[in-house]
Design a protein with these regions (language model features):
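Minor-groove-contacting beta-hairpin "wing" of winged helix-turn-helix DNA-binding domains
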Residues: 55-62
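Short, well-structured alpha-helical interface segments that form or flank functional binding sites
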Residues: 3-7, 34-37, 59
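Short, amphipathic alpha-helical interaction segments positioned at domain boundaries
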Residues: 64-85
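Intrinsic-disorder-associated interaction segments
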Residues: 28-31, 62, 66
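A short, conserved structural fragment
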Residues: 43-53
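Short amphipathic alpha-helical interaction segments
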Residues: 29-45
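Short amphipathic alpha-helical interface segments
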Residues: 1-29
Length: 85
């Protein structure tokens, strides 16, 4: 499941650039089998920001933990080392 966490955070960080107040809909990440569990665990350690909008739930990465998040992604996905700035 750590690999899935890294993949979700990589998608938010690299592809969508969802850091801080830039949110993406939770429903856009349905392909992750353990999505609810992953989101709950990442939110518990404050790496993920969850906001309830009127029509959807938005998620974003916490900029306060950018260094730790990038290190985690590179640990479980070494092929993307250096891609996230």
């Amino acid at each position: 499941m750590e690999k899935e966490k890294a993949q979700l955070m990589f998608k938010l960080a690299f592809s969508k650039r969802n850091w801080g107040a830039k949110y993406d809909r939770l429903e856009h990440f349905k392909r992750f089998q353990n999505l609810d569990k992953i989101v709950k665990e990442l939110n518990k350690i404050n790496w993920l920001i969850i906001t309830k909008k009127q029509n959807y739930t938005g998620i974003s990465l916490n900029t306060k933990f950018k260094k730790e998040i990038v290190e985690f992604i590179e640990l479980y996905m070494p092929e993307v080392r250096g891609w996230i700035k």
